[in-house]
């Protein structure tokens, strides 16, 4: 059980399942919250919204879609959708899950984001510590804003749009669940609130390996996939809601992955045609380095 307690691990090579193992309380097709892996699904949904013209360009300022943001802080006029995709918003927003006395006040905002009845209220008082596009800094508020923009641009709920454009076309094994801030406001937590199973998670990986096609149908444009998987070592490897890593400065020998607390992940190795997906409950451990799976693929495939 090298994949840890309380979880399920799936390895797919050349479209065939070569490893599928779980421990209780998990079982095949059980849905579990995938936490920040949700961000990569939100990035996918953004690409579809761009393809369909709901979002004209990732270079559009966020105020084109949520004009009221400009009233809260003029810097929002400089913030573009691409900055959200790359975690370069510049928000003064603390995100650290280590509970210390010093960090209790700072962690209050992330608690508001995850458990507040209207997370959009956070944007009324948010400050910027960097100019948009200036610096990478991971925080979930950026993807919260991105999911809000998708809903505003499409005039559809996140769940309905995801179901129509991704879940149904890919023939997912089970319905996914999404968390909203409240029934009254109904803003979707696209930054960490999706629950799905390991097989459907792997299908997302296959969609990216297939250049955005599924059974001959283009789900998201190849242009978006290519841009998402663009080989860059800048921005700490985070690009269009995916992490990228390279070995020995060899851009052709690359892998990319989505990762969430508790060790939820999708790992994709293009060169080896391998997808590894995991869901689990390891909340006290952030997990292996993804380079472990690079080495694993080298040895097994």
Residue positions per predicted region:
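A short, well-structured edge-of-sheet supersecondary motif
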Residues: 1-26, 171, 266, 273-277
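Catalytic-site signature segments of enzymes, centered on catalytic residues
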Residues: 29, 98, 105-183, 189
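Non-transmembrane alpha-helical segments in soluble domains
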Residues: 47, 63, 82-85, 120, ...
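Active-site helix/loop module of the DD-peptidase/beta-lactamase fold
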Residues: 52-94, 125-127, 153-191, 196
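Structured C-terminal helix/loop/strand segments within mature extracytoplasmic catalytic/sensor domains
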Residues: 258-301
